[in-house]
Amino acid sequence: MEERTEGTEEGLRYILQPPRNQNVGLFLDAAPLRSWVRQNANNRRVLNLFAYTCGFSLAAIAGGAVQVVNNDMSRPALDWGKENHALNDHPPRQVAYLPHNLMKSWWKVRQFGPYSMVIIDPPTNQRGSFNAEKQYSTVLKQVAKLMEPDSLAAICLNSPFLDHQFLENQVARWMPKARFQQWLPNSPDFPEAEPERALKVGIYRL
């Protein structure tokens, strides 16, 4: 990767590069969720959906996860994530990378299950891959089949047009056994005058 540099968050090192489409390689507003993952991943098998450069995966391994399975349709993003793990000397055998479009098939993710933690952090609307309003239901239905009893789910929505109630309704309908635990607070580094337009992260127990 050209012109790359390194950044550090809570002792973990990340490869960064000048913004491309507003992305430097790490979504900074998701820092509270990375902290939560690290605090709750011990001895868990973690499924990281729409993993991008695997920031949540780094947090999970640092927090004692047994295994993390990273899924994203972008192979370059997952290769970047693999470099991030190597930068932190994480054991390669504990981390899997699946460059695959979930909207076409779930079998690659299913073969590594069941899981005891899942992070779902999809793009709001990415042409050719995912539309949150139309396809979040499919993700929740499939994820519900992959989880062990007493597992944890971090369910994210990063849309200025869809609110907390949308996410609550989706989970209630398509993942009915999920029990709401909390909304994670937004990062103080990214104050939002209209909270419904900011990143929304609901924590559930299945």
Task: State the predicted function of each range.
Residues 102-174:
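S-adenosylmethionine
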Residues 152-206:
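C-terminal catalytic and target-recognition region of SAM-dependent MTase-like enzymes
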Residues 53-66:
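Conserved SAM-binding loop of SAM-dependent methyltransferases across substrates and taxa
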Residues 43-52:
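Conserved class I S-adenosyl-L-methionine
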Residues 28-44:
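Conserved alpha-helix/loop element of class I SAM-dependent methyltransferases that forms part
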Residues 67-72:
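Conserved SAM-binding motif I beta-strand of class I
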Residues 73-119:
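S-adenosyl-L-methionine
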Residues 1-27, 35:
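Non-catalytic substrate-recognition/targeting regions of SAM-dependent transferases
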